[in-house]
């Protein structure tokens, strides 16, 4: 069990029951932690329209506006138009554990889509679909209620009044560019809102949008 450094709350491990597969994906290179420095792990609930980096020549919002911690880097990416959990660390081994192939690290997303997916669409997501960069690995996919912990998005999503929306819980074991969005579009239900809830044992539990906390690894 992990303990927060700046919060009295304790982290709850995230269950991946019914979302298990046998193959896992590749990710980017990692950074090494300088010798003799303690491992630092930052959990950040990234708002919409914030880049997952500390600098941007174009002047867009970055992590620097929220996190006054130096020497930590994101494990994987979370697109500017996506929200939710970003794990930052100075430990390359931890980055590898969260992102590299064969590490068996699932990533849970809550996804608001246009329309109500059919069982055939859900089965296609679970079994893998063929995108322009090849077939996806099997994934967890289920229809769920709107999350009780959901925060308002600014700006709100654009939705058509004549078409209902619904929420999916999707668990991936690979990290392709904009993969969730491409997968739901492929089966006919475009993504309207995308929130990453968990990476391995790390989750958004008790972490408000735009807030961060440090945890022990």
Curated annotation (Swiss-Prot):
How would you classify this enzyme at the top EC level? Answer: isomerase
Keywords attached to this Swiss-Prot or TrEMBL record, sorted alphabetically, are:
Isomerase, rRNA processing
Q: Does the keyword Zinc apply?
A: no
Q: Where is the active site?
A: 79 (nucleophile)
Chain segments carrying region Disordered? 19-38
Which EC numbers does the record give? 5.4.99.20
**Signal peptide positions (record):** none
Transmembrane parts of this sequence? none
Q: Name one GO biological process term.
A: enzyme-directed rRNA pseudouridine synthesis
- Catalysis: reaction(s): uridine(2457) in 23S rRNA = pseudouridine(2457) in 23S rRNA
An example of a GO molecular function for this protein is: 23S rRNA pseudouridine(2457) synthase activity
The Polar residues compositionally biased stretches are: 19-28
What does the UniProt function comment say about this protein? Answer: Responsible for synthesis of pseudouridine from uracil-2457 in 23S ribosomal RNA.
Name the protein family.
Answer: Belongs to the pseudouridine synthase RsuA family.
Return the protein name.
Answer: Ribosomal large subunit pseudouridine synthase E
Question: From what organism does this protein derive?
Answer: Escherichia coli (strain K12)
Q: Quick one: which gene encodes this?
A: rluE
């Amino acid at each position: 069990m992990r303990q927060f450094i700046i919060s009295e709350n304790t982290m709850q491990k995230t269950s991946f029951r019914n979302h298990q597969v046998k193959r896992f994906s590749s990710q980017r290179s990692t950074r090494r932690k300088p010798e003799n420095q303690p491992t630092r792990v930052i959990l950040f609930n990234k708002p919409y329209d914030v880049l997952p980096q500390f600098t941007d020549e174009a002047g867009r919002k970055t992590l620097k506006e929220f996190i006054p911690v130096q020497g930590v880097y994101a494990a994987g990416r979370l697109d500017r138009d996506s929200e939710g959990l970003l794990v930052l660390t100075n430990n390359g081994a931890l980055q590898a554990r969260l992102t590299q192939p064969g590490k068996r690290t699932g990533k849970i997303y809550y996804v608001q889509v246009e329309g109500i997916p059919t069982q055939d669409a859900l089965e296609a997501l679970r079994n893998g679909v063929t995108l322009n960069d090849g077939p996806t690995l099997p994934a967890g996919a289920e229809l769920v209620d709107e999350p009780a912990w959901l925060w308002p998005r600014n700006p709100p999503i654009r939705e058509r009044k004549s078409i209902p929306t619904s929420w999916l819980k999707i668990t991936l074991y690979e990290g392709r560019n904009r993969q969730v969005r491409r997968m739901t579009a492929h089966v006919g239900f475009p993504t309207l809102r995308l929130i990453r809830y968990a990476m391995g044992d790390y989750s958004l539990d008790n972490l408000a949008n735009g807030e961060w906390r440090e945890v022990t690894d």
